[in-house]
């Protein structure tokens, strides 16, 4: 049985009780007024009122009570009918309430100290504090930047945010995708000056890169599966859906071989060079199903020692394939790993210097230099990002209780060109709590949709900030115009009719208009940008002026003497510093002569 809310039933009707009591006094006044007819009583009504209101006690005369109840019911009925037929007016908001944001709108989201903020525009910033005093102003630090070629994505947004490296309250590490290698040259000195460790992964020129070995971050069987998934996802080329069988077969073989390398090979051999050697040694004879190549013999020996070994189980599934099928699988694997036939790439991945799992421990700037015209080696960059996210999330959970001590910001320029980061739609939704943020820089939103398909909307939805720097891609403009909404404007029409007499007419009306239409967005001023922050009105603001940043004077853009010399840095990075920790081993090179 539904419980009656007594409080809700009584409180709204209290005013009508007072009306009823007042009506009893008025009825009493009319009844006590001298006179035998209505006109006489009306003339003497004041006498009746004085008599009736001499006492504030309500009249309980039957006639007066009936009049009071009738008056209360009548007024309640009028109020009910009025409310039922009431029209809802929103003056000047009839067709929409869209407007541009103001300084008061952004104020709750800004930290008073300039260095403790993410730079969004010239006038808008967002605090780096993930847990502000007022929880309703908490926003994740994921940012989507969209701008056509030449709109200033690097100069007006990426570089200013990279120079936000002086905060002691919210220390930050950076992972920067550097398409042409000019960002590290421009800002490397400023970062070093503020205590940052510089690390460089260069797929454009392997000789100007530190070493990166994905095998160095394998610690368990699930890490092997993650590495294989990333490798497959970013070296698939233009494969069709019909290739699914071969992909699964390759996955089995990669998993088995990498598992063997990780658990059985010496540390110095745990790299892609060893994987290539394994595949090259896997000879298959279609006319001899019982033939065993050297890799078969190695797995047979391992199976005798450890029959339940992870690699043995995976290899056993692969060996279910017939000779001709196995040969096709090996050819497919060889084609996929063809880039590792390049000696420089094998040397690059021979061992690891990047220490990706330490970016959340201390202030570090990792620059990932890549080609913006050739994506041959971009799978290596995507693999690096995938391992980076996984390693940092695991370390945050297992070591630091869920939050890294140093926030890690990934500034991914040319995000559509680095390849697909597996499960990015899930990562952007969960990395916030671990003090990790992801900033995607695109030329058009269609790039993201082409790469991530249906997951693109999920990725965009988890970006609390989005900035439009200008562009002409129709899909992006249409979506932005719809997101900005409509405002209500005043319109008037004038008319003139001529005949025997000339008459004029003037008509005023309200209309709805997009805050900015598609054609207006297409011709947006080159110095302007549009910022959208979740829960706040959009802002039409100036792009940030890099020359106004306090650290601009330490960049190569200001003075070429501050250019960061990559070759010199890489040639000197192995020199010991006074505070470096080293291990010393004593070796006896001159033992006692053998008798």
Labelled PLM ranges:
Residues 126-132, 236-245, 267, 490-509:
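Low-complexity, polar-biased intrinsically disordered regions enriched in Pro/Ser/Thr/Gly
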Residues 9, 21-28, 133-436, 451, ...:
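P-loop NTPase motor domains
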Residues 124-125, 130-131, 137, 347-348, ...:
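Mixed-charge, polar/low-complexity N-terminal
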Residues 114-131, 306-324, 482, 489, ...:
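N-terminal short leaders/motifs
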Residues 1-151, 155-163, 168-170, 486, ...:
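Basic- and hydrophobic-enriched, low-structure N-terminal and domain-boundary segments
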């Amino acid at each position: 049985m539904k419980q009656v809310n007594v409080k809700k039933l009584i409180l709204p009707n209290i005013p009508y009780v007072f009306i009823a009591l007042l009506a009893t006094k008025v009825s009493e006044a009319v009844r006590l007024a001298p006179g035998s007819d209505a006109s006489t009583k009306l003339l003497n009504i004041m006498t009746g009122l004085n008599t009736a209101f001499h006492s504030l006690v309500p009249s309980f005369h039957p006639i007066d009570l009936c009049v009071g109840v009738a008056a209360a019911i009548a007024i309640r009925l009028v109020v009910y009918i009025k409310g039922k037929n009431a029209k809802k007016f929103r003056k000047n908001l009839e067709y929409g309430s869209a407007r541009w944001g103001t300084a008061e709108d952004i104020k709750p989201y800004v930290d008073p100290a300039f260095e403790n903020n993410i730079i969004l525009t010239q006038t808008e910033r967002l605090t780096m504090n993930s847990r502000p005093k007022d929880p309703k102003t908490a926003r994740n630090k994921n940012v989507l930047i969209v701008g056509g070629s030449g709109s200033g994505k690097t100069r007006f947004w990426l570089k200013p945010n990279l120079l936000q490296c002086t905060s002691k309250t919210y220390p930050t590490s950076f992972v920067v995708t550097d398409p042409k290698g000019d960002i590290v040259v421009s800002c490397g000195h400023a970062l070093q000056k503020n205590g940052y460790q510089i690390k460089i992964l260069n797929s454009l020129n392997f000789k100007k890169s530190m070493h990166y070995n994905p095998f160095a971050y394998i610690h368990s069987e699930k890490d092997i599966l993650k590495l294989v998934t990333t490798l497959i996802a970013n070296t698939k080329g233009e494969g069709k859906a019909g290739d699914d069988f071969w992909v699964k077969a390759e996955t089995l073989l990669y998993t088995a071989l990498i598992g063997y390398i990780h658990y059985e090979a010496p540390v110095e051999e745990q790299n892609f060079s060893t994987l290539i050697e394994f595949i090259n040694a896997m000879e298959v004879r279609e006319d001899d199903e019982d033939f065993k190549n050297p890799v078969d013999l190695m797995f047979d020996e391992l199976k005798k020692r450890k029959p339940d070994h992870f690699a043995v189980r995976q290899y056993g599934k692969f060996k279910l394939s017939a000779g001709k099928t196995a040969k096709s699988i090996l050819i497919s694997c060889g084609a996929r790993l063809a880039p590792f036939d390049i000696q420089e790439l094998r040397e690059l991945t021979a061992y690891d210097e990047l220490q990706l799992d330490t970016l959340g421990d201390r202030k570090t700037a990792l620059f990932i230099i890549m080609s913006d015209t050739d994506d041959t080696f971009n799978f290596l960059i995507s693999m690096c990002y995938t391992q980076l996210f996984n390693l940092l999330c695991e370390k945050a959970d297992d070591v630091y209780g869920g939050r890294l001590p140093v926030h890690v910001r990934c500034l991914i320029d040319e995000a559509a060109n680095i390849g697909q980061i597996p499960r990015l739609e899930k990562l952007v939704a969960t990395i916030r709590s671990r003090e990790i943020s992801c900033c995607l820089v695109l030329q058009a939103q269609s790039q993201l949709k082409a790469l991530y398909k249906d997951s693109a909307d999920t990725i965009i939805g988890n970006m609390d900030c989005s900035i439009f720097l200008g562009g002409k891609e129709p899909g992006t403009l249409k979506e932005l115009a719809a997101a900005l909404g409509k405002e209500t404007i005043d319109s008037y029409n004038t008319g003139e009719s001529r005949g025997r007499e000339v008459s004029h007419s003037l008509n005023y009306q309200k209309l709805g208009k997009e805050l900015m239409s598609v054609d207006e967005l297409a011709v947006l001023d080159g110095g302007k940008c549009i910022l959208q922050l979740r829960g706040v009105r959009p802002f039409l603001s100036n792009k940030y002026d890099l020359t106004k940043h306090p650290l601009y004077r330490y960049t190569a853009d200001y003075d070429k003497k501050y250019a960061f010399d990559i070759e010199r840095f890489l040639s000197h990075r192995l020199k010991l510093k006074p505070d470096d920790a080293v291990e010393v081993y004593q070796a006896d090179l001159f033992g006692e002569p053998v008798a």
